[in-house]
Curated annotation (Swiss-Prot):
GO terms for biological process, alphabetical: purine nucleobase metabolic process
UniProt keyword list: Gamma-carboxyglutamic acid, Glycoprotein, Hormone, Phosphoprotein, Secreted, Signal, Sulfation, Thyroid hormone, Transport
Function field: Thyroid hormone-binding protein. Probably transports thyroxine from the bloodstream to the brain.
SMART domains linked to this entry: TR_THY
Sites where the protein binds L-thyroxine: 35, 74, 137
Post-translational modification: Sulfonation of the reactive cysteine Cys-30 enhances the stability of the native conformation of TTR, avoiding misassembly of the protein leading to amyloid formation.
Similarity remark: Belongs to the transthyretin family.
InterPro entries: Thyroxine_BS, Transthyretin/HIU_hydrolase, Transthyretin/HIU_hydrolase_d, Transthyretin/HIU_hydrolase_sf, Transthyretin_CS
UniProt protein name: Transthyretin
Species: Pan troglodytes
Length: 147
């Protein structure tokens, strides 16, 4: 249990470090950013498919945005402040394809984070996932945009 807490603390620290702004870009105003880390290799998880869905009025999930993580394990530019309105969103990280590409048979098909966004006004969300073949851990950093 203590090692799990330490792992979560380290993950949260990495997220705070990445909040300073994406590496080498001017996308610090990105309202939704995803960061994926490989716990086995101790490195960013590169080229991981990420799909974002928004819950519709009829309770179904509608595709909202998608992309793949960069060399830094980050995915920016999923949406704009204007498009990212109040609602319930689901971030789905394709963990199976990532591990299969490394020759590993994983347990999970994907990692999933469902959250309510912008219900207290505009916010910026960083969703971070720490992956291993048989487990994953997620955390989020939610900040108020600076004008």
């Amino acid at each position: 249990m203590a090692s799990h807490r330490l792992l979560l603390l380290c993950l949260a620290g990495l997220v705070f470090v990445s909040e300073a702004g994406p590496t080498g870009t001017g996308e610090s105003k990105c309202p939704l950013m995803v960061k994926v880390l490989d716990a086995v290799r101790g490195s960013p998880a590169i080229n991981v498919a990420v799909h974002v869905f928004k819950k519709a009025a009829d309770e179904t999930w509608e595709p909202f945005a998608s992309g793949k993580t960069s060399e830094s394990g980050e995915l920016h530019g999923l949406t704009t402040e204007e498009e990212f309105v109040e609602g319930i969103y689901k971030v789905e990280i394709d963990t199976k394809s990532y591990w299969k590409a490394l020759g590993i048979s994983p347990f999970h098909e994907h990692a999933e984070v469902v959250f309510t966004a912008n219900d207290s006004g505009p916010r910026r969300y960083t969703i971070a996932a720490l992956l291993s073949p048989y487990s994953y851990s997620t955390t989020a950093v939610v900040t108020i945009p600076k004008e």
